[in-house]
Amino acid sequence: MIALRTDFSAKEGPVKPMNAVNNGPAGSAVRQTGNFEAYKEAGFPYARLHDSAFYGGYGGDLSVDVHRIFRNFDADADDPASYIFEPTDEYLSNIAAAGTRIFYRLGAAIEHNYKLGTYPPKDYLKWAKICEHIIRHYNEGWANGFFFGIEYWEIWNEFDCRNQDGSHPCWQGTFSEFAEFYSVAARYLKGRFPHLRIGGPAFASIWDEAAADAFFKVMRRDNVPFDFLSYHAYMSTVKSFRDTVAQANKVFSAYGYGKTEKILNEWNYVKGWTADLWRYSLRTEKGLKGASFAAACMAEGQRSDLDMLMYYDARPCGMNGLFDTDFLQPLKGYYAFKAFSALRELGTCARTETESEELCACAATDGRTHRLLFTRFCDEDAAQTETVKIAVKGVSGPVKATVYATDEARSMAPLREEVFTAEEFALYLQAELFGIYLVEIVPVRQGGENGRTDGHL
């Protein structure tokens, strides 16, 4: 038996946006096969724009990236005619219509093969001025633009990324060149938009000491402002997730940025990047095990010194564990994010304690409705069902507890209900490995067990 204790009277701050993603709703308006309604219902708080150009439904080769919007670097940066905004306009409008806020990555999509947009700009300041106009288009209406109020603007992506063959898919210059480029761009943009959150650099690996040292030495020399620091991590265990977050905080603190907002804005289950391990990783991401890993990491992120977590990827691709890529129907991973969104609806995190490394949990309350999300995850492929004793305190009875399960047979479907009259009680549940469980506790208003309740999942 595994014990899980939850005290809804012990408040631990706001439920953080651990269920943010990369990219927005997908599908064909012509064919009417999109996932817009499901995407909207999931309640993703933010969508980061990265690798968006790889999907035609987002505008393809004409969308998001700086070199795709401003296609001739020698053109006049002040002339609206130098920009192609329309494909990105449509994409961002769809994200905003879904109720998801936009997190705009300024730079280029990853380039594993032919290199076009990942070369160092030949004029760093002009590149920053081009970005200024992109920001003004989407936030201030410039060039027949919009007023989206996009707060987060990230400079570049994974300058430190290296493939096994030694090639660099995201930055064709040196680490030092990138640091100089970033310094110019960040200082210029922050000077133009002091009210916005300007940050980066989306480290591929926070464990690369040479990259971090080259970058932060220039940042400190130039007193570069950071509204947030971003980094990426792919792993196959919750311990690796926890260790990576701790390493990032250690590195940032060592260079004097320990109190800066920290965002892990690419992550997913990856056991290996090549051959059979890569194929296994992709299969896992799209199944229940990948969904359990996502739920576990979101719960762990909530209790970590981390401000936002952004899953890669909601774009139709091999690493999308949220929607299938043929018909855009929800996969098991979708329900992990929808369940975490149910916690964010309540606003305030409540204390949880577990006795097992394989049990990850997070709880939330608004003072009347209480919800607990937990999953059993370990990096194995089979294990016995375990009894989980859920000890609950800090509620006012009588209450009805409803358990929603996501497993191989169910997708966030009601599993059982039980009424409790005491302020402290225990609920026993047979929990499968990789099962994801959301417990909702609501007051019973009148009529006892068959009376009305306030639940609405």
Residue ranges and their predicted role:
Residues 42-236:
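Substrate-binding cleft and catalytic face of glycoside hydrolase catalytic domains
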Residues 268-360:
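Aromatic/acidic polysaccharide-binding cleft in carbohydrate-active enzymes
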Residues 355-397, 433-440, 447-448:
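Carbohydrate-binding surface patches
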Residues 420-457:
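C-terminal beta-strand-rich structural cap/linker in extracellular carbohydrate-active enzymes
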